[in-house]
């Protein structure tokens, strides 16, 4: 097979030589094949720019070059210079000037790498001027001219040694175009682009007149040594300079960015440390098992020691001792608080209407502040701290470069359309996906054109607003037309023209003729997006109608590698200018986006059978968050109603059917709910007076949260009032006061703990969470105060109504005389007393409970180490939001991450040579310059999260100044003398270059830098000068009035970022890179010590918090434990043991909650942190009541006191705490907002369930083992109270006994009168009480 191929090649070469014999009869050293110019190629009608003249056929000896001709040859083709007297060439002065002009376009791209530029020039100098031209050139086609004139050469063959050509190609293969963040060979290799380019394809493109730049056809033959050749042909094998070697004393080697061989050895970043293992077990799991085992063993030892101690104590029990001093101190807080609240409750109950009026006035006065409320809906203002580093960086960026443009984006995939094969004449057989079908493209073109021509009426502007009024127009920002607007899509490869999309043509390539159409042009443009004229017979441009390239990763998605034809999705992106919030153009942009969304919704509905469409506007996220907030308000209203109904029903004591209307508590329940709402409104109004902005999240969640807490207190208070019988001769007001003195310390303990936890939660810098925490903390305090005033007054009035046997709600009507309540024990109390408490505290069950809970604690310690940190933005959306599909498509199909800008602040001298060398990446720049470090980082995208190296205005500015390009020129005469002459001006008046020619890298002086930089930033790029900076850098450099660079930015791209963890790590990695760059640039002479480089990505403001949320959360939660313990310790009577057990239970609830968060898919972030802070406060509700009940019990043994607390306070906690939380929480599960569902429904459900389990299961068992000893002072006081109770009481006619002393006794729950210290403890029943 190989022999046959070589034979065919030899035959082809011989045939070619035979055909060309007429034009190149001699192949000898020192003989030319053509010489002098013969005008334009008559076979070409025109090109992208003015084409060079072709040469005349001339089989003559090479000419001796002297004088100006020699100087010109030495300057343009230095490798052909052999000295002043021995230099021969085959080109005239005109040919040299034409050669220089024709190479200027390509040299502008390659000049940043001197070796590449020189090698490229050398190739064409040899072709045109080599004195041995006939040895490797064979003319194959000429065009006859007039009589007596030599023919014009329009095609020839060039024979090169393959190694020679490949070395030349290798020297240029890595040269970059900074503005496009791509390789220069990508625009010099035709349909193959940079990915498929090689030496043969690179040379073929240069010799193809179809590219619009070549004046004649050149066929390049790359031959191996020893390969058969036509007679006389000797393949060119000239000098090729490696890119990592200097070309002279003053020239610099190519930089690492343009030449891999110049790169220093960059050690790869350290691999991620493997997980810590102990044997085959993960280290965390092993350590937690060891810790849990030690904890269980320690607990078992403590329990055993306590049991032995109790036995010894029982054996040695003698006469009862007098209370010790510590016990008296423990009693003191009980007594003080109990007496205070008893007196307070009695006074409030005595003046109910006055207290209600004063409470109403205070609430109204505070709530009036809501007239000044500022509702924040901007996601940036809600979820990013105003003083955070990311916000400061955003402010700096927006101030100096303007806000990041507004993105309106569409993803489209095909339904039920299978892929197909296409035999491309250019690239062979290719797979095309279903979405890449002509009928689909035509339909999407219609959609795109409808969107481009959208107009919407603006009341403020009193005219129609169109896209051109607000669009981002990089090449014409000042006088924008519709075709100047930046719209990126595959359709831009056809300039949004239906005729061009449907164009077809016949083309012959390598002897094969085939029809070429849009698919061939698409393949060409996807591989070479910088092409101005493709190599097909269609001869279409790949540039968008607004003048910039469309890179395939921005136009299609869902492909592998560079197989763009297999893309599953098409992407259309409309980029709009962004404006400050108070700019009237911002409202215009939002109006256009509103019309854009309506058009897309209509298109999605009408084409649902063909397309799957996902879309988003810049305003979409804010709109959807606001929409779901409004939609979910009824859910919260239903939650309120259910809690209200439960309270109203549960607070009643229904002893007889005939007394239901009287014993109902609907009015009291409604009053309790109104008290909670009043507290919330007052808290929000107070902060509105202070100018603290609020949010819709606060309006939704805070009332629900405070209702859950407030309902607990209401239930416990009323239930205690019903259970605590009125003493003989005791007035209603005194009865209420005594009840309040009994339960208010527990209510104070819980409310104070929760409020402190919320205020500590306000330490988080996230505005929405901080405001939520502040409002919740104040609302809980106000709720407690209103419960101590307004609700006590309501209870007094309700008790008066009930004693008068008036029906609830319709209290103005009196009823007939009703029978007294029937004595009956409630089902809940009976269940706890007869079944639950005996089972839980059985001697075999208690160790099992301890073991299970400690095992659960250990398992959740491990699970909490695996919780995800972050908050994906789609979770802030409702479940039915169209943005859910958009974010799904964005993560699935977009093949590049967001742009990241490395921003430089003021204080760095870019105009100095040292400053330029420290930031650029071309020849002469430092190996560890700013842009070079970003390049190194992009080689390790998995660690640096940078995938595409940065564009560099410094590099392109230097290239723009290079004399060999046609970019920076000056008028030499006329009124604009010495002013900038644009590259589009081809007159002889623009022959003066801005910079003089030098052997080394071009570096302007400070004066030249400040003069030429504004010209560069306003020069539009074009085919003659692709380095113009208007499109890429107009907004990237901020200049002061005297021309100093006060801020600039270098744009790179992240790799695709799929979730919040990726965004967080990308921010962390880019900051580390920027800090490293900053440290080096501060060493440049003249740099301000405060100079800084920082990374800016539009999403940084949202993900900044996740860099520190973990340590901040640990600190905040640990800080919450301190006041919780202190408050419990103080209000439990300076009882250290009770305080520690209380704290232990709360810590276990918290750890179990976090561990189960990982199981249920709840990530850790500022929203869940504030809920965990809430968990600490709510845990107090579940454990503190029972702990306090145990601490004040006078039963002789811990087991009896644990049973006592479980039966009476445990049942109250279940009915009053858990059952008031569950209805409201379960309703949250119906909310549309995923944020509410996940972080409020799921998390609060976990908190409530775990709090209930630890409070009613674990805590009684722990107290039965490790609880504090009985308080002897309390026992003594109870004994004295009992003795006083049996003594005869003096008559007091001023306060006669009520007629119906038991009218307000709830016999469904209440025991007989409990003997105990007045207002020092709850009415906990004795063992001999009757029910």
Curated annotation (Swiss-Prot):
Signal peptide extent: 1-20
Major location category of this protein: membrane
Pfam families per UniProt: NPC1_MLD, NPC1_N, Sterol-sensing
Disulfide bonds: 32-90, 38-56, 77-125, 91-129, 113-254, 116-172, 189-197, 243-259, 256-263, 471-485, 525-542, 920-925, 967-1025, 981-990
SUPFAM superfamilies, per the entry: Multidrug efflux transporter AcrB transmembrane domain
Domain SSD: start-end pairs: 632-797
Cytoplasmic topological domain: 304-352, 654-665, 718-742, 798-846, 1135-1142, 1187-1206, 1264-1331
Residues modified by glycosylation: 53, 85, 138, 244, 416, 431, 464, 479, 497, 506, 606, 626, 909, 917, 996, 1038, 1076
Residue spans crossing the bilayer: 283-303, 353-373, 633-653, 666-686, 697-717, 743-763, 777-797, 847-867, 1114-1134, 1143-1163, 1166-1186, 1207-1227, 1243-1263
Annotated localization: Apical cell membrane; Cell membrane
Catalyzed reaction equations: cholesterol(in) = cholesterol(out); sitosterol(out) = sitosterol(in)
A biological-process GO annotation: cholesterol import
GO function terms (MF aspect): cholesterol binding; heterocyclic compound binding; lipid transporter activity; myosin V binding; protein homodimerization activity; small GTPase binding; vitamin E binding
Keywords (A to Z) from UniProt: Cell membrane, Cholesterol metabolism, Disulfide bond, Glycoprotein, Lipid metabolism, Membrane, Signal, Steroid metabolism, Sterol metabolism, Transmembrane, Transmembrane helix, Transport
PTM field: Highly glycosylated.
Ranges in the topological domain labelled Extracellular: 21-282, 374-632, 687-696, 764-776, 868-1113, 1164-1165, 1228-1242
Tissue expression summary: Small intestine showed the highest level of expression. Expression in other tissues including gall bladder, liver, testis and stomach is also observed. Along the duodenum-ileum axis, the levels vary in different segments of the intestine with peak expression in the proximal jejunum. Protein expression is confined to the enterocyte. Discrete localization to the epithelial layer bordering the luminal space along the crypt-villus axis. Protein expression in the enterocyte is observed closest to the luminal space.
Function recorded in the entry: Plays a major role in cholesterol homeostasis. Critical for the uptake of cholesterol across the plasma membrane of the intestinal enterocyte. Involved in plant sterol absorption, it transports sitosterol, although at lower rates than cholesterol. Is the direct molecular target of ezetimibe, a drug that inhibits cholesterol absorption and is approved for the treatment of hypercholesterolemia. May have a function in the transport of multiple lipids and their homeostasis, thereby influencing lipid metabolism regulation. May be involved in caveolin trafficking from the plasma membrane.
Family to which this protein belongs: Belongs to the patched family.
Record protein name field: NPC1-like intracellular cholesterol transporter 1
Organism classification: Eukaryota, Metazoa, Chordata, Craniata, Vertebrata
Gene that specifies this protein: Npc1l1
């Amino acid at each position: 097979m190989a022999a046959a191929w070589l034979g065919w090649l030899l035959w082809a070469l011989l045939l070619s030589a035979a055909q060309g014999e007429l034009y190149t009869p001699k192949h000898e050293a020192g003989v030319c094949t053509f010489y002098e110019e013969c005008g334009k190629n008559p076979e070409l009608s025109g090109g992208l720019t003015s084409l060079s003249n072709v040469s005349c056929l001339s089989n003559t000896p090479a000419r001796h070059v002297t004088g100006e001709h020699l100087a010109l040859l030495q300057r343009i083709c230095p490798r052909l210079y052999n000295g002043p007297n021995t230099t021969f060439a085959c080109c005239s002065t005109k040919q040299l000037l034409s050669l220089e002009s024709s190479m200027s376009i390509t040299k502008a791209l390659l000049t940043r790498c001197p070796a590449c530029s020189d090698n490229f020039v050398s190739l064409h100098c040899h072709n045109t001027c080599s004195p041995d031209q006939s040895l490797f050139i064979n003319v194959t086609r000429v065009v006859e001219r007039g009589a007596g004139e030599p023919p014009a050469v329009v095609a020839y063959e060039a024979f090169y040694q393959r190694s020679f050509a490949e070395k030349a190609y290798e020297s240029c293969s890595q040269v970059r175009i900074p503005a496009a963040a791509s390789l220069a060979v990508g625009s010099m290799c035709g349909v193959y682009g940079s990915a498929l380019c090689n030496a043969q394809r690179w040379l073929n493109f240069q010799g193809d007149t179809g590219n619009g730049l070549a004046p004649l056809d050149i066929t390049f033959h790359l031959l191996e040594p020893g390969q058969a050749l036509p007679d006389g042909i000797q393949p060119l094998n000239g000098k090729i300079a490696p890119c990592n070697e200097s070309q002279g004393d003053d020239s610099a080697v190519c930089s690492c960015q343009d030449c891999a061989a110049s790169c220093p050895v960059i050690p790869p970043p350290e691999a991620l440390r493997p997980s810590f293992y102990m044997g085959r077990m993960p280290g965390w799991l092993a350590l937690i098992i060891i810790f849990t085992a030690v904890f269980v063993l320690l607990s078992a030892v403590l329990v055993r020691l306590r049991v032995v101690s109790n036995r010894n104590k029982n054996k040695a029990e003698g006469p009862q001792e007098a209370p010790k001093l510590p016990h008296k101190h423990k009693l003191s807080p009980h007594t003080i608080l109990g007496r205070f609240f008893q007196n307070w409750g009695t006074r409030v109950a005595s003046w109910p209407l006055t207290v209600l009026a004063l409470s109403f006035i205070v609430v109204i006065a505070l709530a009036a502040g809501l007239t000044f409320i500022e509702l924040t809906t901007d996601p940036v203002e809600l979820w990013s701290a105003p003083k955070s580093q990311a916000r400061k960086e955003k402010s700096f960026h927006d101030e100096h470069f303007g806000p990041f443009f507004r993105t309106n984006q569409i993803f489209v995939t095909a339904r039920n359309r299978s892929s197909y094969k296409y035999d491309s004449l250019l690239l062979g057989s290719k797979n095309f996906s279903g979405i890449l079908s002509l009928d689909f493209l035509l339909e999407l073109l219609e959609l795109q054109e409808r969107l481009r021509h959208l107009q919407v009426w603006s009341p403020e502007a009193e005219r129609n607003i169109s896209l051109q009024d607000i669009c981002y127009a990089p090449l014409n920002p000042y006088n924008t037309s519709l075709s100047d607007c930046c719209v990126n899509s595959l359709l831009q490869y056809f300039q949004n023209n239906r005729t061009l999309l449907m164009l077809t043509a016949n083309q012959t390539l390598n002897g094969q003729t085939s029809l070429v159409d849009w698919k061939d042009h698409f393949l060409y443009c996807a591989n070479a997006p910088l092409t101005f004229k493709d190599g097909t017979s269609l001869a279409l441009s790949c540039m968008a109608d607004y003048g910039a390239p469309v890179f395939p990763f921005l136009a299609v998605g869902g492909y592998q590698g560079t197989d763009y034809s297999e893309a599953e999705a098409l992407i259309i992106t409309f980029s709009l200018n962004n404006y400050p919030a108070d700019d009237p153009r911002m409202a215009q942009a939002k109006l256009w986006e509103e019309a854009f969304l309506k058009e897309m919704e209509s298109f999605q509905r009408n084409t649902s059978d063909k397309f799957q469409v996902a879309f988003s506007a810049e305003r979409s996220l804010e709109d959807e968050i606001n929409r779901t907030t409004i939609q979910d308000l009824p859910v919260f209203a239903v939650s309120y109603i259910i809690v209200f109904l439960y309270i109203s029903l549960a607070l009643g004591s229904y002893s007889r059917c005939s007394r239901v209307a009287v014993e109902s508590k609907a009015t009291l329940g409604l009053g309790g709910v109104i008290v909670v709402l009043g507290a919330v409104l007052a808290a929000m109004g107070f902060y509105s007076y202070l100018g603290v902005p609020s949010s819709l999240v606060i309006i939704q969640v805070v009332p629900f949260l405070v209702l859950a807490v407030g309902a607990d207190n209401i239930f416990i208070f009323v239930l205690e009032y019903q259970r605590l019988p009125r003493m003989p001769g005791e007035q209603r007001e005194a009865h209420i006061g005594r009840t309040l003195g009994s339960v208010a310390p527990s209510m104070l303990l819980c409310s104070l703990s929760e409020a402190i936890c919320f205020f500590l939660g306000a330490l988080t810098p996230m505005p929405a969470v901080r405001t939520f925490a502040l409002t919740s903390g104040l609302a809980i305090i106000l709720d407690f105060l209103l419960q101590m005033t307004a609700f006590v007054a309501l209870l007094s009035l309700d008790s008066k109504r009930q004693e008068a046997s008036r029906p609830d709600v319709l209290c103005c009507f009196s009823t007939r005389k009703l029978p007294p309540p029937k004595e009956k024990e409630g089902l809940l109390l009976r269940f706890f007393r007869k079944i639950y408490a005996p089972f839980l505290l059985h001697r075999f069950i208690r160790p099992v409970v301890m073991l299970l809970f400690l095992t659960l604690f250990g398992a959740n310690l491990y699970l909490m180490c695996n919780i995800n940190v972050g908050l994906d933005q789609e979770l802030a959306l409702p479940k039915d939001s169209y943005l859910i599909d958009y974010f799904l498509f964005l993560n699935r199909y977009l093949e590049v991450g967001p742009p990241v800008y490395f921003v430089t602040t003021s204080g760095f001298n870019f105009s100095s040579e040292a400053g330029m060398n420290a930031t650029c990446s071309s020849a002469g720049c430092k190996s560890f310059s700013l842009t070079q470090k970003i390049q190194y980082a992009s080689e390790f995208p998995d660690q640096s999260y940078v995938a595409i190296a940065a564009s560099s205005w410094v590099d392109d500015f230097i290239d723009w100044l290079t004399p060999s390009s046609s970019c920076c020129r000056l008028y030499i005469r006329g009124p604009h003398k010495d002013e900038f002459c644009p590259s589009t001006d081809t007159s002889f008046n623009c022959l003066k270059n801005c910079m003089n020619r030098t052997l080394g890298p071009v570096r302007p002086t400070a004066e030249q830098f400040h003069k030429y930089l504004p010209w560069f930033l306003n020069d539009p790029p074009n085919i003659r000068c692709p380095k113009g900076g208007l499109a890429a850098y107009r907004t990237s450099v901020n200049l002061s009035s005297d021309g100093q660079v006060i801020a600039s930015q270098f744009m790179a791209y992240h790799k695709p970022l799929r979730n919040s963890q990726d965004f967080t790590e990308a921010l962390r990695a880019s900051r580390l890179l920027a800090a490293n760059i900053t440290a080096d640039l501060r060493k440049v002479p003249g740099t301000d010590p405060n100079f800084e480089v920082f990374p800016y990505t539009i999403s940084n403001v949202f993900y900044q918090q996740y860099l520190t949320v973990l340590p901040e959360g640990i600190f905040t939660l640990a800080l919450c434990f301190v006041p919780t313990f202190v408050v419990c310790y103080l209000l439990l009577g300076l009882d250290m043991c009770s305080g520690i057990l209380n704290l232990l239970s709360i810590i276990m609830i918290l750890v179990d909650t976090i561990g189960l968060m990982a199981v249920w898919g709840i990530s850790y972030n500022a929203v869940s942190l504030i809920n965990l802070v809430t968990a600490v406060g709510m845990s107090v509700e579940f454990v503190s009541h029972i702990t306090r009940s145990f601490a004040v019990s006078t039963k002789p043994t811990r087991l009896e006191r644990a049973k006592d607390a479980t039966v009476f306070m445990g049942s109250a906690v279940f009915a009053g705490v858990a059952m008031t939380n569950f209805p409201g929480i379960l309703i949250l599960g119906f909310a549309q907002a995923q944020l509410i569902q996940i972080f409020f429904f799921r998390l609060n459900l976990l908190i409530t369930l775990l709090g209930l389990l630890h409070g009613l299961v674990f805590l009684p068992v722990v107290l039965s083992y490790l609880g504090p000893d009985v308080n002897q002072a309390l026992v003594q006081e109870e004994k004295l109270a009992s003795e006083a109770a049996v003594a005869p009481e003096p008559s007091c006619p001023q306060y006669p006994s009520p007629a119906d002393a038991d009218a307000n006794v709830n016999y469904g729950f209440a025991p007989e009168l409990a003997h105990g210290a007045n207002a020092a403890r709850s009415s906990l029943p004795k063992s001999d009480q009757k029910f």
